[in-house]
Amino acid sequence: MFKKSVILIVVFLFPVICSGQEVRLQEVAVLRKDIAVNIQYLVSVPQEDPPVEGWPLMLFLHGLGECGSDINRVKKHGPPKLIENGKKFPFVVVSPQCPRGSRWEPWELTSILDEVIKSNDIDEDRIYITGLSMGGFGTWNLAAYSPERFAAIAPICGGGNTLDGKLLIHLPVWVFHGAEDKVVPASFSESMVAAIQKAGGGPKITIYPHAGHDCWTKTYENPELYTWMLNKRRRKKSEK
């Protein structure tokens, strides 16, 4: 088969070579098509004037139970719940809602970020991702899709593709999981951490010994998470 293929190539190219004429065997084409993104999201912007460099931004991805078209469902857990109860964060919080039957798509989330950045004064060196359960998976996936865009990520009770570990070695990562999680085993998070470590990265991981699937409540109520995030900035290309 290999020999036959080589012969065919020579036969087909021979007239081109002998003719002395330049023949373009491959044409260049460009697809330009706008793809509609129809996802609603919550945005919380601090009331104060933004810092000179702009507001940091945290993207929050909810779990499977909050999918749908009722945006109020997004307020059930995590930062949106805290904000609804009066919590004031010193950064912009963006909380999209994934339509039912769909999953978190990186290109859609990137489009949302672009739109929010266009409409607000945002420090693009301090953009963070966090999410719980399905949103934890979405956090890993989006970070691997565009690791150079983010300053830090905090996936909670999620998991990802361990082959992506090498893409995340320069990204600050703090992972959270409950040891007794029967929905998404803690091994999903542990394997991602191990993959990053094997590739040369240094992620953090917190395993709550007596927590089940809901380890996000105590995580999002812990001020240390936000302090850690806000101390991280996107790496410059020269630092890589």
Name each model feature, range by range.
Residues 2-17:
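Sec-dependent N-terminal signal peptides
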Residues 57, 61-110:
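Active-site machinery of serine-nucleophile hydrolases
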Residues 89-91, 168-173:
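Short, proline-enriched alpha-helix->beta-strand connector loops that line the catalytic pocket
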Residues 172-240:
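C-terminal catalytic histidine-bearing segment of alpha/beta-hydrolase fold enzymes
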